[in-house]
A protein has these predicted regions:
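Seventh transmembrane helix
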Residues: 261-264, 270-273, 293-344
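Hydrophobic residues within alpha-helical transmembrane segments
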Residues: 22-25, 54-57, 61, 68, ...
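Class A (rhodopsin-like) GPCR signature focused on the TM5-ICL3 interface and adjacent 7TM helical core
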Residues: 103-115, 148-154, 181-216, 254-276, ...
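Loop architecture of class A 7-transmembrane GPCRs
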Residues: 1-6, 74, 78-94, 127-130, ...
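Helix-to-loop junction signature of class
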Residues: 20, 61-77, 90, 97-104, ...
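Intrinsically disordered regulatory tails of 7TM GPCRs
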Residues: 1-7, 157, 209-252, 315-358
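Extracellular TM2-ECL1-early TM3 structural module of rhodopsin-like
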Residues: 9-21, 47-107, 114-124
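First transmembrane helix
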Residues: 12-39
């Protein structure tokens, strides 16, 4: 059966397309700055920054190779780029989405190992190997969407969708592949990241209580007793603990914001993708078009979300942006080389009784 025409006025479609073009611009510029900062500053090429740059690169590719065609299709309510590119666009969309999710998953596991397990083993070399492996895995998972699948887009005789999507199918193989995509893109990463962040939160809470209790014990000692003790020769001063709790709280809050952003942006799209393949009634209904636009908007919003969060929450990123933006007119600005310094993030979360935490 043929799909119903989308009940969205032309003015609204053009407005949505214009906003999407604005999202493309912001997403491209913000993520490009992230990549260039890491590329041009040797001191910024730590393992975590290499991962963030890869995440930014996948968002750039999503902004350039997928979002413009979606904006045109939303404005014209017609897919004008041919059936061949329709299939290719599906593959590219899932490739860059899977790569971005893979990087988020690697970062989450790395934070878990550092803070909870006290194992800081992710070197820049290992990060590069993980990045290469994630690209290969993402390509292998997304490649089957190019062949043997019924696709749909606005004006192609199937469902009215704002971009090429995996359409309704009775095939068990097609449905199984859709479930695989949903599991790989959302459900497994969500479960792993949720577990990691809950463990991180529990660890930070325990360390906070330890610091609070330790400080209270020493603050309750009578002043006279402290004076008499200090007069004794060879007696060490009471250990002092200085922990930047505001930094710890802010760092974890930043991680939590990224996780919440991932969940909000991808849960609706995952549900819509599953319904489109399993429910013929939903796929060919008039509500599929506006619902698809909303889900796609949220998924594309992720390309804008990450650099905004970096600039808002990370002081070093803001400082690097301030250094870089005035030089952006130069093609190859010379940056003085800096010695590389291995940063141990686990030190931030270690309660030491002999030295202050970094």
């Amino acid at each position: 059966s043929e799909a119903a025409t989308p009940l969205i006025p032309v003015t609204l479609r053009v407005t949505l397309a214009a906003i999407m073009i604005f999202m493309i611009t912001i997403g491209f510029l913000g993520n490009a700055i992230v990549c260039l900062i890491v590329y041009q500053k040797p001191a910024m090429r730590s393992a975590i920054n290499l991962l963030l740059a890869t995440l930014a690169f996948s968002d750039i590719m999503l902004s350039l190779l997928c979002m413009p065609f979606t904006a045109v299709t939303v404005a014209t309510a017609d897919w004008s780029f041919g059936s061949g590119f329709c299939r290719a666009s599906i593959m590219l969309y899932w490739l860059f989405v899977l790569e971005g999710v893979s990087i988020l998953l690697i970062i989450s596991v790395d934070r878990f190992l550092i803070i909870v397990q006290r194992q800081d083993k992710l070197t820049p070399h290992r990060a590069k190997l993980l990045i290469a492996g994630s690209w290969v895995l993402s390509l292998c998972v997304s490649l089957p969407s190019v062949v043997g699948w019924r696709t749909g887009a606005a004006g192609m005789g199937a469902a009215w969708a704002p971009q090429c999507v995996l359409g309704y199918s009775d095939s068990l193989a097609d449905r199984g592949y859709t479930v695989l995509l949903a599991v790989a893109v959302f459900f497994v990463p969500f479960a792993v990241m949720l577990y990691s962040y809950m463990c991180i939160l529990n660890t930070v809470r325990r360390n906070t209580l330890r610091i609070h209790n330790h400080t209270s014990e020493h603050s309750c000692l009578p002043a006279l007793n402290q004076v008499s003790k200090m007069r004794l020769t060879g007696l060490q001063r009471p250990p002092q603990i200085k922990v930047d709790m505001s930094f710890k709280t802010r760092a974890f809050t930043t991680i939590l914001i990224l996780f919440v952003g991932f969940s909000v942006c991808w849960l609706p799209h995952t549900v819509v993708s599953l319904l489109a393949v399993f429910s013929r009634r939903f796929y060919y209904s008039s509500v599929f078009y506006p619902v698809s636009i909303g889900a796609l908007w949220l998924s594309y919003l992720k390309t804008v979300f990450n650099p905004v969060i970096y600039c808002w929450r990370i002081r070093k990123f803001r400082e690097a942006c301030q250094e870089f933006i005035p030089k952006s007119c130069r093609l190859c600005p010379r940056v003085p080389g800096r010695s590389r310094r291995r940063v141990r993030p686990s030190n931030i979360y270690v309660c030491s009784e002999t030295q202050s935490a970094v």
